[in-house]
Amino acid sequence: MNGTEGPFFYVPMVNTTGIVRSPYDYPQYYLVSPAAYAALGAYMFLLILLGFPINFLTLYVTIEHKKLRTPLNYILLNLAVADLFMVFGGFTTTMYTSMHGYFVLGRLGCNMEGFFATLGGEIGLWSLVVLAVERWLVVCKPISNFRFGENHAIMGLAFTWVMACSCAVPPLVGWSRYIPEGMQCSCGVDYYTRAEGFNNESFVIYMFACHFIIPMCVVFFCYGRLLCAVKEAAAAQQESETTQRAEKEVTRMVVIMGIAFLICWCPYASVAWYIFTHQGSEFGPVFMTLPAFFAKTSSVYNPLIYILMNKQFRHCMITTLCCGKNPFEEEEGASTASKTEASSVSSSSVSPA
C-alpha cells in the first residue's frame, strides 16, 4: 500500500521514515509546503467572498419582489440554499483547517464538514435535475396541458432533500465514512480504503450510480430534447426573428449548463472513481485536492447560470441594488418585449425561469 491508513484517516504517503502523523492532531506539512495550505485557505476565502453575497442576494431579491415567487423559482431558491449550505457548512471549515495545515476540528468536525459539503452539493445537483425535468415537461409537452404549479414545486423540493440526505447521511451512521482527503484539510467520502465494517465498496458504487450517472443522464436527456423542440419551432417559422433569437438563447443556455455540469463534477468523480478502483496505488495529496476544491466553485457559477440569466430576476436584482430604481430599465424593457410569441415554444417556457 502506497499510503498510511489509521483510525478514520488515510494519508497518501508511506510511513517509512516515521513522519506521517494523524491529520486530526498534527500539521501535514510533510505532504506539501505550508504555502500550499495558505493558498487553499485564500482560495476558500475567495469562494466565501463571492458565494455568500450572490446566493444571499438571490434569496433576498426573491423575498422582496412578489412577482419572483413563482413555483419554478422555488427550485432556484433551493439551489441558492444548497450553495449557502456549502459556504457555511463546508467552505468556512475548510478555510480554517487550511490555515492550520491539518484538520484541527477533529473527527466530529470532519463528519460535519463532510456532511454539509455533501448535502449542499447533492441538493444543488438534484435541483438541477428537477429544473431539467420541468423544462422538458413544459417545452416538449410529453404530457399535454401540463403546468408546473406550486404542488409540483413542493414535491420537487422534497425530492431534492430526500435524495441529498440519502447520500449525505449514510456515512454518518456506518455505511462508509467521512475522512480527510487529499492534503488532509477537507473531508469527503472514503474512496481510499476497504475499512472493515464500513462497506465502503457498496456505498461508493451506490453513490456513483444513483448520485452521479443517473442525474447526469437525466439532465442531458431533458435538455437535449429541449434543444430539439426549439429547433423544430424555429424551422416551422423561418421568418420569425424572435423565434430565431429564442433558439439562439436556449442553445447558449443548454451549452453552458452542459459544460458547467461536466466541468464541475466530472474531474472530481473521475479522480474519486480512479482512487476507488486503484486502492493502494501511488498518488500524491494534490491529486484529489485539486478536483475536490475545484468542484466547490459550483456555489459561485450555479447562481450565475441558473438565476442571473433570468431577465426578470436580473431586473429585480438591479432595482434592489439601486434602491428601487433600475437605470437600465429601458434596455431591460426592450429586451423583455422581444420575447418570442411562437405557438410551440415561447421564451417564457424556454428561459431558465
Curated annotation (Swiss-Prot):
The residue stretches assigned to a coiled coil in this entry are none
The record's section on PROSITE patterns has: G_PROTEIN_RECEP_F1_1, G_PROTEIN_RECEP_F1_2, OPSIN
Pfam families assigned: 7tm_1 (PF00001), Rhodopsin_N (PF10413)
Extracellular topology ranges: 1-36, 97-110, 174-202, 275-286
Where is the stretch described as Disordered? 331-353
GO cellular component annotations, sorted alphabetically? membrane; photoreceptor disc membrane; plasma membrane
Q: Report TM segments.
A: 37-61, 74-96, 111-133, 153-173, 203-224, 253-274, 287-308
What is the designated name of this protein? Rhodopsin
What is the scientific name of the source organism?
A: Dicentrarchus labrax (European seabass)
Its gene? rho
